């Protein structure tokens, strides 16, 4: 199974995602925002990143820019409730522009998250 870096500022969402991923055998390391995620990414080997977009501190877009700017091609699944004061349709193109492999929206179903992860890991 995969070793996944989860970047999410909401403890509730983080716990939900962690439990879903662990239920199918994935291991999960967690960071509450982008700066901490970059430190974990530099210190360890991950198969995939699952990140929120809109977080305090370094958000998911800035994280994607840093990751892709460094030449790292690790798969990234974005989970987002949408941009503050922007329609949900704004998030997917923005995330894709900066290198996200897949975008899913909160609230999401367990199967939707697992399908997105399976899709990007099999590419």
Positions of PLM-derived features:
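Conserved acidic carboxylate
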Residues: 8
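Two-component/phosphorelay signaling modules centered on CheY-like receiver
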Residues: 11-29
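Helix N-cap/capping motif at the beta->alpha junctions
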Residues: 30-39, 60
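Active-site beta3 strand of CheY-like receiver
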Residues: 44-50
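Active-site residues of response regulator receiver
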Residues: 52, 80
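Receiver (REC) domain active-site loop signature in two-component systems and cognate sites
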Residues: 55
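Short amphipathic alpha-helix used as the core "switch/output" element in two-component signaling
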Residues: 61-73
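Alpha4 helix (beta4-alpha4-beta5 surface) of REC/receiver domains from two-component response regulators
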Residues: 62, 83-104, 115
């Amino acid at each position: 199974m995969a070793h996944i870096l989860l970047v999410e500022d909401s403890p509730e969402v983080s716990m939900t995602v962690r439990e879903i991923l662990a239920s199918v055998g994935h291991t999960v390391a967690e960071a509450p925002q982008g700066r901490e995620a970059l430190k974990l990414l530099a210190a360890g080997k991950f198969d995939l990143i699952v990140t929120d977009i809109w977080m305090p501190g370094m958000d998911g877009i800035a994280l994607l820019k840093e990751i892709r700017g460094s030449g790292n091609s690790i798969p990234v699944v974005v989970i987002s409730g949408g941009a503050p004061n922007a329609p949900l349709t704004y998030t997917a193109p923005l995330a894709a522009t900066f290198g996200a492999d897949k975008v899913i929206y909160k609230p999401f179903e367990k199967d939707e998250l697992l399908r997105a992860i399976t899709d990007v890991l099999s590419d």
